[in-house]
């Protein structure tokens, strides 16, 4: 039944992945070793979207864990849910990629990739009806970015008709982890534009802001950030894992969200965001959820949608929510903010409902938006890329692994094209299209 194979690559991907598995194990009533002790049949009904059933009422995540050094894997294995994963599904090298995209994509990563694909193949063969793949990784490093994109293109080759969703941590404007981040990110975006069906952009800085501003945490840890990401990942996949009134899956999401194949980079948000202690004091209503969900401060990527327009967006509500109320609220938002939605896609907001809320909440909503303002994010990376590339700074690390400067130029221009495509559709209006159409008609007649 509609299984998904999950891959996590690199340190960032493995940490987000671990948080995600912790979240959904909780939602499905599994303890740290995968034994089911839940209360509701609904938890079991579609367990097999993400879990394989083993003997003795035990469930094992359909996850492949990949890294080029053993450190992060050991940490996952030692963590609270480390006993959940199948031991054969840990695939790791010893050398590390050292934040070098070329090492992940061409040298070290390429040596390990066949081993990973064997595990992926084995997981895929065990599925009744494989729906697709999801991968968690960061775009700024070596393994998640370089090897992650290599895996995506290899899986694409072998399973061309399956969905490929990526949860990608993009470099943030102020907080930079490594100097060569702009290179790694640009090379990765170049790959994602071609090979991914939907990319959910997550950005550490936006997550920090949410933790500080909304959750009032004075010094948030990566654990807190990953917890936010896992809430969104769980929300996006709710409809697959629980029966709902209006269901959606990876493919339906893509069909509704991607008007043009290259423009598949989404902003995500989650509501209600309340600090850990505060949620028990107030009831959340659908209007509040909708309000909060569309608030720029809630977006997990550092671009403000008010600087662009939504091509499409999708909202997934969970809990005991009235269908009518949700539709009224969503229509309301669209009418009030009509200038932020392109008018040439008339019904560009999609809603899905699922009756089972996340743990500890009565209702929640997850927001996925395809906004032209995501170009800010690519522009920023592009500017940093250009600044360094003009001086050929740090290039020897990449050319030393057998890369060519040509490849950098290609990646740069592909990302610039992406930015201008977003801009083109942001500026497009209905009337333009009609005028062009009228001009074209007589030409056909002349022939």
Swiss-Prot record:
PANTHER family on file: TUBULIN
Keywords: Antibiotic resistance, Cytoplasm, Cytoskeleton, GTP-binding, Magnesium, Metal-binding, Microtubule, Nucleotide-binding
Binding annotation for Mg(2+): 69
Positions of GTP binding: 11, 69, 138, 142-144, 204, 226
Name assigned to this protein: Tubulin beta chain
Gene Ontology cellular component terms for the protein in this record: cytoplasm; microtubule
Chain residue ranges for the region called Disordered: 425-447
Keyword GTP-binding in annotation: yes
Mutagenesis / variant outcome for changing residue 198 to A: In resistance to benomyl and benzimidazole
Gene3D superfamilies: Helix hairpin bin (1.10.287.600), Tubulin/FtsZ, C-terminal domain (3.30.1330.20), Tubulin/FtsZ, GTPase domain (3.40.50.1440)
Primary residence: cytoplasm
Keyword Metal-binding belongs to the record: yes
Any GO MF annotation of the entry: structural constituent of cytoskeleton
Reported cofactor(s): Mg(2+)
Protein role: Tubulin is the major constituent of microtubules, a cylinder consisting of laterally associated linear protofilaments composed of alpha- and beta-tubulin heterodimers. Microtubules grow by the addition of GTP-tubulin dimers to the microtubule end, where a stabilizing cap forms. Below the cap, tubulin dimers are in GDP-bound state, owing to GTPase activity of alpha-tubulin.
Pfam family, one: Tubulin_C
Family matches, as SUPFAM superfamilies: Tubulin C-terminal domain-like, Tubulin nucleotide-binding domain-like
Record-stated family: Belongs to the tubulin family.
Compartments where found: Cytoplasm, Cytoskeleton
Biased composition (Acidic residues): 432-447
InterPro entries: Beta-tubulin_BS, Beta_tubulin, Tub_FtsZ_C, Tubulin, Tubulin/FtsZ-like_C, Tubulin/FtsZ_2-layer-sand-dom, Tubulin/FtsZ_GTPase_sf, Tubulin_C
Oligomeric form and interacting partners: Dimer of alpha and beta chains. A typical microtubule is a hollow water-filled tube with an outer diameter of 25 nm and an inner diameter of 15 nM. Alpha-beta heterodimers associate head-to-tail to form protofilaments running lengthwise along the microtubule wall with the beta-tubulin subunit facing the microtubule plus end conferring a structural polarity. Microtubules usually have 13 protofilaments but different protofilament numbers can be found in some organisms and specialized cells.
């Amino acid at each position: 039944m509609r299984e998904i194979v999950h891959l996590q690559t690199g340190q960032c991907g493995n940490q987000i992945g671990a948080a995600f598995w912790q979240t959904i194990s909780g939602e499905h009533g599994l303890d740290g070793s995968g034994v089911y002790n839940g209360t509701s049949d609904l938890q079991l009904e579609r367990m097999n979207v993400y879990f394989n059933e083993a003997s003795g009422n035990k469930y094992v995540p359909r996850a492949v864990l990949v890294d080029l050094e053993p450190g992060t894997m050991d940490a996952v294995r030692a963590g609270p849910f480390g006993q959940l994963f199948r031991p054969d599904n840990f695939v790791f090298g010893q050398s590390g990629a050292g934040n070098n995209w070329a090492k992940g994509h061409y040298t070290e990563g390429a040596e390990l990739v066949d081993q990973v694909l064997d595990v992926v193949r084995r997981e895929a063969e065990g599925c009744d009806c494989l729906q697709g793949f999801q991968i968690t990784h960061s775009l700024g490093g070596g393994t998640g970015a370089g090897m992650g994109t290599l895996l995506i293109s290899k899986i694409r080759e072998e399973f061309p008709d399956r969905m490929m969703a990526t949860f990608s941590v993009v470099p943030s404007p102020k907080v930079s982890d490594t100097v060569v981040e702009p290179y790694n990110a640009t090379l990765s975006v170049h790959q994602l534009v071609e090979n991914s069906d939907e990319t959910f952009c997550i950005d550490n800085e936006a997550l920090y802001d949410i933790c500080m501003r909304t959750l009032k945490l004075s010094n948030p840890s990566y654990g807190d950030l990953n917890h936010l990401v896992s809430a969104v990942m769980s929300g996006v996949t709710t409809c697959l894992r629980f029966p709902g009134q209006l269901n959606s899956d990876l493919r339906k999401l893509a069909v509704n969200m991607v008007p043009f194949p290259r423009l598949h980079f989404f902003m995500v948000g989650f509501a209600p965001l309340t600090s850990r202690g505060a949620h028990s004091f107030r009831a959340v209503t659908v209007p509040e959820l909708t309000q909060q969900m569309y608030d720029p401060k809630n977006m997990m990527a550092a671009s403000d949608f008010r600087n662009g327009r939504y091509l499409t967006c999708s909202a997934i509500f969970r809990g005991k929510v009235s269908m009518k109320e949700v539709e009224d609220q969503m229509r309301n938002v669209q009418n009030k903010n009509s200038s932020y939605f392109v008018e040439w896609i008339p019904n560009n907001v999609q809603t899905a409902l699922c009756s089972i809320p996340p743990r500890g909440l009565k209702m929640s909503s997850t927001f996925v938006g395809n906004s032209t303002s995501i170009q800010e994010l690519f522009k920023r990376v592009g500017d940093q890329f250009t600044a360094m590339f003009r001086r050929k700074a740090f290039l020897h690390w990449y050319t030393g692994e057998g890369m060519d400067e040509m490849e950098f130029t290609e990646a740069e221009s592909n990302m610039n094209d992406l930015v201008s495509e977003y801009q083109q559709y942001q500026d497009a209006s209905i009337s333009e299209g009609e005028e062009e159409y009228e001009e074209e008609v007589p030409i056909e007649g002349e022939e």
